[in-house]
Amino acid sequence: MPKTVVIPPGTGKPLAPYVPGTLADGVLYVSGTLPLDAEANVVHEGDAGAQTRHVLETIKSVVEAAGGSMDDVTFNHIFLKDWADYGAINAVYAEYFPGEKPARYCIQCGLVKPTALVEIASVAHLGKPA
């Protein structure tokens, strides 16, 4: 099956061997996205809401680079470091999905960068082949 790698302009080097997004058969898979700048430094340390906004803006850039919009996102995998941040994460998340919400799950776990508070991976259905 043909696939297309999606790397938005200005994307920093990934922390491991992966790409920001892969489009195959009209489905976009967005890699786990941390609140990182182009040099892989965590941004907005200690602020789960600001980190969530940064992560969702990064995901939005991947989806848009593939020709879609956030309305095309059908599933989100949310990883958070501390349940105490659940409300702040949800408040920002709701801004990006004001209409019909995508399916999702949310788990608490350790993240690869110790000061990161949230990571999100997404799936979007764009309705067009790679």
Curated annotation (Swiss-Prot):
Record's GO cellular component terms: cytosol
Keywords noted in UniProt: Hydrolase
InterPro entries in the record: RutC, RutC-like_sf, YjgF/YER057c/UK114
Origin: domain of life: Bacteria
Reactions the enzyme catalyzes: (Z)-3-aminoacrylate + H2O + H(+) = 3-oxopropanoate + NH4(+)
Top-tier EC class: hydrolase
Keyword Hydrolase: yes
Signal sequence annotation: none
Pfam families: Ribonuc_L-PSP
EC number in record: 3.5.-.-
Listed GO MF terms: deaminase activity
GO biological process terms, semicolon-separated: nitrogen utilization; uracil catabolic process
HAMAP family, per database record: RutC
Assigned protein family: Belongs to the RutC family.
Role: Involved in pyrimidine catabolism. Catalyzes the deamination of 3-aminoacrylate to malonic semialdehyde, a reaction that can also occur spontaneously. RutC may facilitate the reaction and modulate the metabolic fitness, rather than catalyzing essential functions.
Protein's recorded name: 3-aminoacrylate deaminase RutC
Originating organism: Methylorubrum populi (strain ATCC BAA-705 / NCIMB 13946 / BJ001) (Methylobacterium populi)
Gene this protein is translated from: rutC
